[in-house]
Amino acid sequence: MLLNTKQMRLRRAKATRIKIGNSRQFRLSVHKSNNHIYAQILDPSSNRVIVSASTVEAEVKKQYPSGGTIEAAKYVGHLVAKKSIESQIYEVAFDRSGFKYHGRIKALADAARSAGMKF
């Protein structure tokens, strides 16, 4: 059975989420589209969103009208880290949702780390 690109990404994401779910840590989940990038911190017990940031938000959109850039991803990473530290969440497991750790995903992760998050 041949899988297309999206099916392969979802398969990788499922395997990663099983490993993260067993660790019982807060999860920094990242999703990207061609035009935007989204980051959420989820509670390990109830899978509810505690903190979120994305390029759709007015604050980010004002500075970066095109949300599909590496600079916008860095800003979202910094913003989600700042919000999580305000919520007293310092350590998370990074869930890249099956995307390659490259480009915008890497930029978001590096910005979150430099803002004080540990993963």
From Swiss-Prot:
Gene3D superfamilies: 3.30.420.100. The keyword RNA-binding applies. Keywords: Ribonucleoprotein, Ribosomal protein, RNA-binding, rRNA-binding. One of its GO terms (molecular function) is structural constituent of ribosome. GO terms for cellular component: cytosolic large ribosomal subunit. Pfam families: Ribosomal_L18p. Transmembrane segments: none annotated. The keyword Chaperone does not apply. GO terms for biological process: translation. Part of the 50S ribosomal subunit; part of the 5S rRNA/L5/L18/L25 subcomplex. Contacts the 5S and 23S rRNAs. PANTHER family: 39S RIBOSOMAL PROTEIN L18, MITOCHONDRIAL, LARGE RIBOSOMAL SUBUNIT PROTEIN UL18M. NCBIfam families: L18_bact (TIGR00060). This is one of the proteins that bind and probably mediate the attachment of the 5S RNA into the large ribosomal subunit, where it forms part of the central protuberance. Belongs to the universal ribosomal protein uL18 family. This is Large ribosomal subunit protein uL18. It comes from Nitrosomonas europaea (strain ATCC 19718 / CIP 103999 / KCTC 2705 / NBRC 14298).
